[in-house]
């Protein structure tokens, strides 16, 4: 019903937030438990947060003059028996992942400057002979970020940098490709029908299937977690190089190391 969708929008636009618990669903049969908590207030049952307080849903409906929605055929299944909750969490994580990937490049570029690193591993020619899209994008991003840097352009005595600097295009690039893949899975999912059974009126058929199963998302989320963890791993190794007293930098990046702790911890 249009009123069902409208009431969901009314809740959101008026900061009426249903209380949803973070335990209770496996995702193997849809997000039954969290979605039940999310949509109970539509029918005047359950609890919500409103004006910073936990309230009974029916009292908030009364305050706004809203009648509890009377669900029609199959609306309950459509609201509860799907992957909306895990999809929403995934979209939130994806937005953060895109931002973290960009910030990882910015931080790594500054680290490369501080470590007196070479720009050679970021040149386009070396990316093109192993043309993974994320790797190419990372090389281009670093060339733009470091263009005109006197530290980068000055003469280097060392022939090459440690892996954690030299392999940034490959590692950051692989994470970019992983994020892009997971985003494609999510985009498909949030534009899909995931309840059950599914009605095909044009064919006069009702089919009990398994579109409620969260496996496509679960595998993708594990992939995303691995990819983001790699950004953290390689960043930690660069930090280690920066604080070891190499290339003219003081130990722990502080004057009088030993007396002063600096970035020891």
Give the location of each predicted region.
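C-terminal catalytic subdomain
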Residues: 215-265
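A short glycine/serine-rich beta->alpha loop
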Residues: 17-26, 68, 206-215, 252-261
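Short beta-alpha connecting loops at secondary-structure transitions
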Residues: 88, 124-128, 167, 208-209, ...
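Accessory "access/gating" subregions that flank catalytic or transport cores
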Residues: 112-233
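Acidic, glycine-rich active-site loops and adjacent beta-strand->loop/helix elements
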Residues: 12, 24-26, 30, 204, ...
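An acidic intrinsically disordered interaction segment
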Residues: 2, 48-60, 180-195, 233, ...
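Active-site-adjacent bridging/hinge elements
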Residues: 76-82, 195-203, 242-248
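Active-site cavity-forming subdomains of large catalytic enzyme subunits
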Residues: 1-129
């Amino acid at each position: 019903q249009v009123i069902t969708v409208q009431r969901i929008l009314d809740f959101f636009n008026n900061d009426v937030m249903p209380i949803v618990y973070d335990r209770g669903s496996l995702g193997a049969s849809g997000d039954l438990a969290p979605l039940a908590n999310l949509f109970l207030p539509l029918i005047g049952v359950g609890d919500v947060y409103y004006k910073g307080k936990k309230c009974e849903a029916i009292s908030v409906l009364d305050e706004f003059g809203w009648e509890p929605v009377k669900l029609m055929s199959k609306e309950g299944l459509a609201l509860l028996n799907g992957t909306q909750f895990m999809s929403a969490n995934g979209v939130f994580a994806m937005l953060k992942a895109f931002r973290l990937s960009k910030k990882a490049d910015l931080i790594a570029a500054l680290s490369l400057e501080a470590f007196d690193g070479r720009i050679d591993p970021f040149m386009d020619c070396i990316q093109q002979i192993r043309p993974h899209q994320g790797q190419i994008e990372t090389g281009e991003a670093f060339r733009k970020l470091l263009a005109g840097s006197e530290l980068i352009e000055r003469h280097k005595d060392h022939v090459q940098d440690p892996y954690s600097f030299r392999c940034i295009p490959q590692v950051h690039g692989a994470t970019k490709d992983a994020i892009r893949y997971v985003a494609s899975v999510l985009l498909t999912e949030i534009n899909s029908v995931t309840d059950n059974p599914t009605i095909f009126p044009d064919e006069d058929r009702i089919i009990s299937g398994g579109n409620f199963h969260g496996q496509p998302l679960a595998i993708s989320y594990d992939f995303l977690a691995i990819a983001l963890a790699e950004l953290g791993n390689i960043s930690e190794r660069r930090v280690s190089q920066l604080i070891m007293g190499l290339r003219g930098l003081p130990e722990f990046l502080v004057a009088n190391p030993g007396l002063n702790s600096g970035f020891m911890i």
